[in-house]
Amino acid sequence: MKKIIYSTLIFTILISGMWACKKSFLESDPQTGVKFDANFFKDRKDFDGFMFGGYAEIQGAGSFFNLGIQQWIVDGGAMMQDIRDRSEQPYNLLSYATPTSTVSSAWQTCYKTIGRANLLLSKVQTSPGSLTDPEKNLLTGEAKFLRGFAFYSLAQRYGDAVIYLTPYDVADQAALSLARSPEAQVWAQVILDLKDAAAILPLNWDAGNTGRATKGAALAYLANAYMYVKDWPNAKKASQDLIALGKYSLLPNMRNLFSHLTENTAESIFEIQYKFVPGSKIAWSGQPNYGNFLNWFTGPLGAGAPYAIFGGQGTYPTARKLADSFDPNDKRRKELIKVPGESYAGETMAGQTYNIPLNITQKNSAFNAKWWTGAANQAGIEEWFWNQNIIVMRYAEFLLNYSEILFESGDVAGAYSNLNLVRARAGLANLVAQTNKEIFLTDLMKERRWELFWEPNIWYHYTRTGRAAKFLLDEYGLVMAPKFNKFPIPQGDIDLNPKLIQNTGY
């Protein structure tokens, strides 16, 4: 299928914050830092181009300073300690104690996305007749999904957040300098946006628009939002609406979920698109690439060509403790995690099989084969980039979420039935249904860890269910301060807006 590339090349990014901008012959949106001609929004192509910029923020393509969803994967896994084996590369929780760490980029990414959505919603309504009513409706649904997704991410990571719902005049500093709203109000806004989006968005897009938000994506995140506020009846309803679409299913082979050869499959609900662009560079040096960095980050240190990009960066090995926690018969362990002494035939190893030496430099670690597939086989700096998509929400995760929703709704049998669907794909026997909530949650969180390691949402299942501190103590002997259930607000934003109050403990 043809991929949609979330290109922002038609825009000039002039600022990184929301307040630092000035007037010129171009309009400037203070929320996004994007300048564009006052008459830019003339037709559907212009609206689509601006919309794609919202996806590009999530994608974080071609930039070390805003890795988008890639950095969110790393941050969550590092907090869990399942990324970077502690015996070789300890990752202290205090790395996240300062509001100048990498988690700042998530806050800024979300508000840039919200800014684009707000501006687009305003322009759609004031379009001078260049859009048909169905086009206006569709663009409205898509913009509300992106805004809802961004507010969802803010509430999930930071709790309280500033709720901006309209574009602002550049000179109106009072309108920009708002206080954070309580987390409950942020979730209420998420639900409003995603309900609207789910009612409008299509089941599928044509091949030329693969990757744009769909009805299924809106319903999946709507169900999750209801989980956060413990509205189990509505969470169940949204989940049932998604199942009724008849679109999604588990792939028989998990390897196909993490492959540049098989993307946008029946298991994918929301998937960020990447593409290798020959002759491109990283964002600060010419035309940016639209590949992701995870293959480069996860290749074993010193593996050599053609087994890893640049012979193996080894930035983020996987914790051996995670690898050892799997049932020996679990296909997920066999196919998606490798340890020294095992063999791996990645997709881009020139047809060769890599026998991982027992004395490899990172000999105490494991290696994540969800993203490590071998050398990218590109020239020079281009090899950093890889065109494998990143699935942000997939059906297996949805089924595990639905399992929790059903248990909380009193349907224990249904809860275990959905959990066991995921286990069956992994080659494991069914678990016997347990009515004790603590036993069920223990079963469920183990399954989430084994299924969703090195994916965007796993850490937040632990914080949402209040089990993060217990997990770190039981698995890694770490005492987690309560503040780490949420990330710190970027100090630069607090300096610009004194009404922003830092999260407790930071």
Give short role names for the model-derived ranges:
Residues 4, 16-42, 190, 223, ...:
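Bacterial Sec-dependent N-terminal signal peptides
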Residues 90, 321-394:
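Flexible, polar/acidic helix-loop-strand segments at domain edges
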Residues 21-22, 55, 80, 110-113, ...:
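Long, intrinsically disordered, low-complexity segments
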Residues 44-52, 56-62, 83-158, 181-188, ...:
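Conserved, well-structured interaction surfaces
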Residues 22-84, 165, 195-196, 212-356:
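An aromatic- and glycine-enriched ligand-binding surface/loop that stacks and positions planar moieties
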